[in-house]
């Protein structure tokens, strides 16, 4: 049975365009369209769509308000459309905080190499959300106010890798069973995609300011969004969070977010770690790419790495995690039940690369426990 989709946008042209693309896929069916947030809230209650695509700026009721109301009344997976501007990035992050699960630039052909790829990209994102077995809104972290620090750095998820099917679900480890290995680490890596902004916020806001290791964050995200996302995390977290810049020296208690549209690598000069930011190759599906950062860390840090793969579509991170494991590093994955899309974590869990499958609720405490001896 086709996944039922509600398309919401104040532009009749965009409603028609999105509907045509969605309906080209036999696994998808647009059951209705709405021209503002108020209509979307009512139609969601009346029609029970499985996925909603939502614009942000609309008359009567904007998209962010509509997301909040839908999540309060009849929670449904929502894909936001956003402009590639600073204000658009901020609004999109607000929508994700309100409960939306994923986003695409409104001109989504800008993050694809051709028209066919753009069509496939939208279809896959909608299907990824519609395939969730049970929709449960992710519990938003309760964050005590932290005095924001200025971000010290400067200022796309454009892959069309099919969603990985969970053919052999991996059992999640309860928190009580997760024991610190006693290993000594020098670096924490976290890679993620769909659902990652909320997941990263939930994990990182629980870290103390004196977290003992540098942290590299690889989130599939357009270049226009990563500065705003790093700034937002920096204001919410006790640790420092910045967008990575070429030549940054790694410091304990600082998280470095890979810039959108670029590749982030790490190298060692004696005991000092240093970031290299390089232009992303046109042939690479992911910019930034988890595999590239993980692979560079395997060469620079060997087994002194704890690498975590969080929610995301596709299999980015699997090959880099394989290299890390061969070097002696520890690999963890988010469990299926707490993922927005169980693609990237499943790719490392079902192949035996990950040694633990941990729920998002338990991930921060598990990382802190494992890092304590570092």
From Swiss-Prot:
Domain CheB-type methylesterase: from-to ranges: 174-374
Post-translational events: Phosphorylated by CheA. Phosphorylation of the N-terminal regulatory domain activates the methylesterase activity.
Cell compartments where the protein resides: Cytoplasm
Modified residues (4-aspartylphosphate): 55
A GO molecular-function descriptor: phosphorelay response regulator activity
Extent of Polar residues compositional bias: 149-167
GO biological process: chemotaxis
Source superkingdom: Bacteria
This enzyme's EC code(s): 3.1.1.61, 3.5.1.44
Entry keyword set: Chemotaxis, Cytoplasm, Hydrolase, Phosphoprotein
Enzyme class name: hydrolase
NADP listed as a keyword: no
Domain Response regulatory: 4-121
Oxidoreductase keyword on record: no
Catalyzed chemical reaction(s): [protein]-L-glutamate 5-O-methyl ester + H2O = L-glutamyl-[protein] + methanol + H(+); L-glutaminyl-[protein] + H2O = L-glutamyl-[protein] + NH4(+)
Pfam families in alphabetical order: CheB_methylest, Response_reg
GO cellular component: cytoplasm
Annotated InterPro entries: CheB-like, CheB_C, CheY-like_superfamily, Sig_transdc_resp-reg_Me-estase, Sig_transdc_resp-reg_receiver
Free-text note regarding domains: Contains a C-terminal catalytic domain, and an N-terminal region which modulates catalytic activity.
Family, as annotated: Belongs to the CheB family.
Record's function text: Involved in chemotaxis. Part of a chemotaxis signal transduction system that modulates chemotaxis in response to various stimuli. Catalyzes the demethylation of specific methylglutamate residues introduced into the chemoreceptors (methyl-accepting chemotaxis proteins or MCP) by CheR. Also mediates the irreversible deamidation of specific glutamine residues to glutamic acid.
Record's protein name: Protein-glutamate methylesterase/protein-glutamine glutaminase 1
Source organism of this protein record: Shewanella oneidensis (strain ATCC 700550 / JCM 31522 / CIP 106686 / LMG 19005 / NCIMB 14063 / MR-1)
